[in-house]
Swiss-Prot record:
UniProt cofactor note: Divalent cations such as manganese, cobalt, nickel and magnesium.
Subunit structure: Homodimer.
Keywords: Lyase, Magnesium, Metal-binding, Pyruvate, Transferase
Protein's name according to its UniProt entry: (R)-citramalyl-CoA lyase
Induction conditions: Under autotrophic growth conditions.
Catalytic center residues: 247
pH-linked activity: Optimum pH is 7 (at 55 degrees Celsius).
Coiled-coil blocks: none
Binding site for a divalent metal cation: 13, 214, 216, 256
Annotated residues for binding of substrate: 12
Free-text activity regulation comment from the record: Activated by dithioerythritol (DTE) (in vitro).
Gene Ontology BP terms: carbon fixation by 3-hydroxypropionate cycle; glyoxylate catabolic process; ketone body biosynthetic process; L-leucine catabolic process
């Protein structure tokens, strides 16, 4: 069965809403534990103003420490995606990421003006204009980039977000050179039928670009949404170790879907991820101890039924 790629965003989206700021060395240890478990892609942080998001302070130091410890920030996965990425909200963030050695970055905006204003102090259209300008610099510098579309399934401020608006943003992003589109359910508003419909539309309209789904489990629909997306052809998913995460600019944006719970789901479906579930659960236990609290992920508490990828042949005959 065709493999899926899991992008662990715990070092960025997972930690950015935590009350305590972890030292760069601790965040590097988190990244290395994810790598040791076989996680193929990791979002190492975001190049944002540390006064606004203090949890991301020292991201340039993290990149430097990874290089010093022998990690190649230009390394690629078996399906030719860059192993390391980071979020950049603007031109300055991109310049810092490029100077730190990143070869892939994720630009971010919201599909709704309400969330985009809360996060970036501008409308979605204004963010797209800025992206068009500095995408030229990204391509000139030989880097690649994706565009993360927040509030793709609904906005905590504006409510309904039309699929046509999301599609138009995704197509514009591809037109300016994006090689990845990340559809984000920022506050966990989506339901499976909605996810399947939008993912199918985006896959049909931009078939040659990686489409990644970024889900929050705010209302306990995250894993059903992931399964619905997989059924229509999504093969790349963001998730966060332990199910931690949230957005400081979006009310109630709690909890990414947990990497270990998602791996367990795919193991049971017979879908390879390349990730060692036991090692991932151990990493989650370490993160729980580091943060000093239980984490939302469940498979480590209950114990896995599917510690490895299983054959679905008995169920399909």
């Amino acid at each position: 069965m065709e493999a899926v790629t899991i992008v662990d965003v715990a070092p960025r989206d997972g930690l950015q809403n935590e009350p305590d700021v972890l030292e760069p060395a601790t965040r590097v240890e988190l990244i290395e534990r994810l790598l040791a478990a076989g996680v193929p892609r990791i979002e190492i942080g975001s190049f944002v103003n540390p006064r606004q998001v203090p949890q991301m302070a020292g991201i340039d130091q993290i990149a430097r420490m990874l290089i010093e410890r022998g990690h190649n920030l230009a390394a690629r996965t078996t399906n030719d995606l860059f192993r390391f990425t980071a979020l950049v909200p603007n031109q300055r963030g991109y310049e810092l990421a490029a100077a730190a050695g990143l070869r892939h970055v994720r630009l971010v905006l919201a599909a709704s003006d309400g969330l985009n204003r809360a996060n970036f102090k501008r409308t979605t259209a204004e963010s797209l204009i800025e992206f068009s300008r500095f995408a030229l610099n990204i391509r000139r510098d030989g880097l690649t980039f994706g565009v993360a579309i927040g509030a793709a399934f609904g906005c905590p401020f504006d409510g309904y977000v039309s699929p046509e608006r999301v599609r138009a943003i995704a197509e514009h992003a591809v037109d300016i050179g994006a090689g990845e589109i990340i559809l984000a359910d920022t506050t966990g508003m989506a339901v499976p039928t909605q996810v399947a419909a939008l993912c199918r539309t985006i896959l049909d309209r931009i078939p040659d670009v990686t489409v990644t789904l970024h889900l929050h489990n705010t209302r306990n629909t995250g894993y059903a949404n992931a399964f619905a997306a997989w059924q229509v052809g999504i093969r790349s998913f963001d998730a966060a170790l332990g199910g931690i995460g949230g957005c400081p600019f979006a009310p109630r944006a709690v909890g990414n879907i947990a990497s270990e719970d998602l791996v367990h789901l795919f193991n049971g479906l017979g879908v390879p991820t390349g990730i060692d579930l036991s090692a991932l659960i151990a990493a989650s236990d370490w993160l729980s101890a580091t943060l000093g609290r239980p984490l939302p992920a469940l498979v480590g508490k209950a114990g896995p039924v599917y510690p490895q990828v299983v054959s679905m042949a008995p169920y399909l005959s």
